[in-house]
């Protein structure tokens, strides 16, 4: 295996294609903000609102990228995302961040969705790791306190989905229109785990440590259906199961995010338990979630597999399978990681206009989804490149 050549592919993809596109096309120097929507064809919508998920993911990505390549332009992108989040998203009266904000800084949707609040913590922790900015650390810790106060469920464990802007119960808790309106979800827990893990890197206190362990246990004991090797997506407050959908992208993403959390926590028995789960979930994903050409299906609902290959499950497959190879040293997982990367190179990367398509359909032609939007930032593909560079660096040492 020529590790150096393999690594260079990810380095070039990250700097020349993904980050370069965001610097040149998504940041608007005149308005000092980001375009909240850009189509596949490159049409820009200056009036489009910025979502919290989108803006925090820009902050995380460019902060993380700066740690690999400390360049002034990456710092500027991170600084601008930081400024926008602090000046316009942060609720000065109640704390926490709004769901979406218009380009002029006025809130569009003021709800507090804990998925987005977690991404704020994840990004602020990364900004501190990159620039040692004390305000970022302060904000990340404040968000931890708010989430423990308003999202944590002391009765049944885990975290609820959403509150109003002033932390009251809300009658619509859904993350997006396609989600169920329930109290708890796998997706929100996955990104709270990811955020708390990053916070623990910068704020090593017992309170955070206990919560990282609690979240890993929630995944192993409640969210993972051990019998079938899939994560359950939706629950009532008391963990009554509310869905029978298999999400292959989330399954493979969770294998490595759970493992990362366990390793940051550093408890041997938890690491071993997570590794066992990661191997089983990887095997199930290979057997059920991959098409013959190497693309990962979006999901299976009511026995029907959706023949759609969105960008983000492909990115998570590269890292997830590589991580399982690192755990097992079984060549098949490395092969599947490389196969996923080849599928991305062949079908997902937009070689003409830059960045990645939303995905491809069964005919392997690009889907109509926007290239940049509330749910499409530089995070899944940018993080994949950085994770692969980091992991290959460790092997080369």
Model-derived features with residue positions:
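Glycan-recognition and catalytic cores of secretory/periplasmic carbohydrate-active enzymes
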Residues: 1-397
């Amino acid at each position: 295996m020529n590790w150096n050549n393999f690594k260079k592919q990810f380095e070039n993809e990250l700097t020349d294609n993904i980050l370069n596109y965001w610097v040149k096309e998504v940041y608007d120097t005149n308005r000092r903000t980001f375009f909240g929507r850009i189509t596949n064809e490159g049409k820009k919508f200056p009036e489009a609102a910025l979502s919290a998920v989108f803006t925090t993911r820009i902050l995380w990505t460019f902060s993380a990228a700066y740690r690999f390549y400390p360049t002034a332009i990456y710092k500027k992108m991170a600084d601008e995302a930081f400024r926008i989040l602090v000046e316009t998203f942060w609720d000065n009266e109640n704390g926490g961040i709004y769901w979406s904000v218009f380009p002029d800084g006025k809130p569009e949707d003021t709800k507090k969705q804990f998925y987005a609040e977690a991404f704020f913590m994840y990004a602020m922790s990364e900004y501190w790791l990159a620039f040692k900015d004390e305000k970022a650390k302060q904000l990340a810790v404040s968000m931890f306190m708010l989430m423990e106060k308003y999202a944590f469920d002391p009765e049944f464990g885990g975290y609820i989905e959403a509150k109003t802007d002033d932390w009251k119960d809300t009658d619509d808790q859904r993350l997006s229109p396609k989600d169920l309106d329930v109290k708890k979800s796998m997706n929100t827990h996955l990104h709270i785990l990811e955020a708390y893990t990053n916070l623990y890197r910068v704020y090593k206190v017992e309170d955070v440590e206990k919560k990282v362990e609690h979240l890993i246990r929630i995944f192993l004991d409640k969210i993972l259906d051990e019998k079938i090797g899939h994560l359950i997506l939706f629950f009532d407050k008391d963990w009554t199961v509310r869905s029978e959908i298999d999400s292959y992208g989330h399954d493979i993403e969770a294998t490595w995010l759970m493992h990362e959390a366990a390793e940051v926590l550093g408890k041997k028995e938890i690491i071993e338990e997570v590794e066992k789960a990661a191997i089983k979930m990887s095997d199930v994903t290979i057997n059920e979630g991959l098409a013959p050409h190497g693309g990962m299906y979006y999901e299976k609902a009511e026995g029907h597999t959706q023949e759609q290959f969105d960008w983000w499950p492909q990115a998570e497959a590269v890292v997830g399978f590589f991580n399982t190879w690192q755990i097992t040293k079984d060549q098949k997982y490395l092969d599947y990681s490389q196969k996923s990367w080849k599928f991305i190179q062949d079908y997902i990367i937009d070689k003409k206009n830059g960045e990645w398509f939303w995905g491809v359909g069964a005919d392997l032609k690009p889907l109509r989804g926007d290239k940049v939007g509330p749910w499409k930032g530089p995070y899944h593909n940018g993080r994949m490149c950085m994770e692969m560079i980091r992991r290959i660096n460790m092997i080369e040492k």
